[in-house]
Amino acid sequence: MSFTIAIIGRPNVGKSTLFNRLVGQKLALVDDLPGVTRDRREGEARLGDLEFTIIDTAGLDEGAKGSLTARMQEQTEAAIAQADALFFVVDARIGLTPTDRAFADFARRANKPVLLVANKSEGKHGDAGAMEAFALGLGDPIQISAEHGEGMGELYDALAKLMPEPVEEDEDEDDAPLSEEEAATRPIRVAIVGRPNAGKSTLINHLLGEERLLTSPEAGTTRDSIAVEINWKGREFRVFDTAGLRRRSRIEEKLEKLSVADALRAVRFAEVVVLMMDTQNRFEEQDLRIADLVEREGRALVLAANKWDLMETKGGGAISGLRRDADHWLPQVKGVPIVAVSGLMGEGIDRLMQAIQDAYAVWNRRVSTSALNRWFEQAVQANPPPAVSGRRLKLNYITQTKARPPSFVLFCSRADAVPQSYLRYLTNSMREAFDLPGTPVRITLREKANPFAHKRKRPS
């Protein structure tokens, strides 16, 4: 069982900076504005030879009952209940505030080991605030600078006394080549994206069976890409809920820009992307832009038509209408899976999870060279390539170079002369022949070398 630590404290004391330092990459948004982190988020952390799970939380703050701030506090309380130990973080430059003192009592009542961390201790101004932290009665403050990496040795010494002896384990490298068996058992990385307030967090909360992610009628409740583990019928999924992707003209605040960048990183890290659309306002310009981004990044795509419970007309006719719209507006991912869901009511969840698993299998698919070239001969015979500048194009053969997504190289006589329309014909024909709906298909043109090009001409 992994040792788990929750980082707690009032807003803007540097909790997310410490989280990023321990995880080793920027998984949490960091800014000078209070309350940047809204949900609790987890990561696998390392400090020297110590390995543990770390939870970053929203800043402890007092808010009206039922307000978003109050629910942020509930998320923090849930993280404390899950943790084996706590990092209570204070700002050494500012010193103690009444909020620090109030929530120090809160931390003591948790009955968990607490390490008092005086962050932002670099320079002369940090010493006074760190000394002031003694008054909290949580032991000696550990002076660090999460931003600059100072004091990590002292934090290591204190944490090592709390943790059990580490157990040696073999670790799979995340980017190591996978066998078919490994690909079938490894957690599928899924990013759930969409416009703000499309219902992304509500859907994940229903999958988890708990309010792990904050939800609100206010657009933009989620700010970070939040990763959660889900087991569905014995299959593991790592699901990223993301900040809503808005039109660029509406991204005004600095924090909003950080959130969108975080969502884009989640798309690039994912293997399957679920684009959630409001059923009553589907295929708006921003939906199409997001789908195009997913295709360009080479990720498998699944469309989730959310709020299906609000539709007046349901059934096969409504789904067929969705399919026609999708094929019209998204020809680059023709046949993309579409699932009608209600994140609030829990309708369509099983179908969505199966669609994700199917899309992942298609994204990983390899086609044998013999089957590929049998199809290729038939496709070219049925619709030969056009003549360009009075010369017939010669298409030689095709081979698959990789999966994830399926990528192919087509050898031909003049690569720059093959029309894009003919390339689209081959792509759509291949999708139909090998059942590759919705996943990006890459066909790269390459000229076949002329074996006689470099031979000397015989003397006459």
UniProtKB/Swiss-Prot annotation:
GTP 2 binds at residues 194-201, 241-245, 306-309. GO terms for biological process: ribosome biogenesis. It comes from the Bacteria. InterPro entries: G_ENGA, GTP-bd, GTPase_Der, KH_dom-like, KH_dom-like_a/b, P-loop_NTPase, Small_GTP-bd. The keyword GTP-binding applies. Residues 365-449 form the KH-like domain. It holds the Pfam family MMR_HSR1. GO terms for molecular function: GTP binding. Keywords: GTP-binding, Nucleotide-binding, Repeat, Ribosome biogenesis. Residues 3-167, 188-364 form the EngA-type G domain. Gene3D superfamilies: 3.30.300.20, P-loop containing nucleotide triphosphate hydrolases. GTP 1 binds at residues 9-16, 56-60, 119-122. GTPase that plays an essential role in the late steps of ribosome biogenesis. Belongs to the TRAFAC class TrmE-Era-EngA-EngB-Septin-like GTPase superfamily. EngA (Der) GTPase family. Associates with the 50S ribosomal subunit. HAMAP family: GTPase_Der (MF_00195). PANTHER family: GTPASE DER. This is GTPase Der. The lineage of its organism: Bacteria, Pseudomonadati, Pseudomonadota, Alphaproteobacteria, Hyphomicrobiales.
